[in-house]
């Protein structure tokens, strides 16, 4: 009943045949759909590409001094250190761990060097001030609950503390995530930030 029809896959939806392409198809018979071109690749090509990207990442981890690295058949990485070859495994040495710790410490505080943070220093400081004042007022309220004082209610400190803490936490977290480039966080959404 049914002739041997080729199976349709999602990749076929992105390819234009000669009759779909219009008056000027490309010479290969498959027209490009705008700037994107989808083509099928064999599984071994994808696996080979994945292996190369892992080796590139491994080389970035292992080569702190910028030496050239090439993959070795046994899975290690060889580097050229002033003329002689040495093979290192992918395990980190103590010096690599300490230098990566130093880099992570610098990366932790590097968000303060962002140009928009420097330009809007007052807004950032006000956000931290809201956070700290809110924490202090809440802690004073907790202290009054633990050791009550006659004539002073802890609610006087809790309510303003929460009212200051919530926007302070929101702005500090939002600014930090925007500097780090997290998806959905942009300085454009903070009305007091000058762009």
Swiss-Prot record:
<keyword id="KW-0812">Transmembrane</keyword>
<feature type="topological domain" description="Cytoplasmic">
    <location>
        <begin position="176"/>
        <end position="195"/>
    </location>
</feature>
<dbReference type="InterPro" id="IPR039714">
    <property type="entry name" value="TMEM134"/>
</dbReference>
<feature type="topological domain" description="Cytoplasmic">
    <location>
        <begin position="1"/>
        <end position="122"/>
    </location>
</feature>
<dbReference type="GO" id="GO:0005829">
    <property type="term" value="C:cytosol"/>
</dbReference>
<dbReference type="GO" id="GO:0016020">
    <property type="term" value="C:membrane"/>
</dbReference>
<feature type="region of interest" description="Disordered">
    <location>
        <begin position="14"/>
        <end position="33"/>
    </location>
</feature>
<protein>
    <recommendedName>
        <fullName>Transmembrane protein 134</fullName>
    </recommendedName>
</protein>
<dbReference type="Pfam" id="PF05915">
    <property type="entry name" value="TMEM_230_134"/>
</dbReference>
<feature type="topological domain" description="Extracellular">
    <location>
        <begin position="144"/>
        <end position="154"/>
    </location>
</feature>
<feature type="transmembrane region" description="Helical">
    <location>
        <begin position="123"/>
        <end position="143"/>
    </location>
</feature>
<keyword id="KW-0472">Membrane</keyword>
<keyword id="KW-0597">Phosphoprotein</keyword>
<keyword id="KW-0963">Cytoplasm</keyword>
<keyword id="KW-1133">Transmembrane helix</keyword>
<feature type="compositionally biased region" description="Acidic residues">
    <location>
        <begin position="14"/>
        <end position="23"/>
    </location>
</feature>
<feature type="region of interest" description="Disordered">
    <location>
        <begin position="48"/>
        <end position="84"/>
    </location>
</feature>
<feature type="modified residue" description="Phosphoserine">
    <location>
        <position position="93"/>
    </location>
</feature>
<dbReference type="InterPro" id="IPR008590">
    <property type="entry name" value="TMEM_230/134"/>
</dbReference>
<feature type="transmembrane region" description="Helical">
    <location>
        <begin position="155"/>
        <end position="175"/>
    </location>
</feature>
<dbReference type="GO" id="GO:0048471">
    <property type="term" value="C:perinuclear region of cytoplasm"/>
</dbReference>
<comment type="similarity">
    <text>Belongs to the TMEM134/TMEM230 family.</text>
</comment>
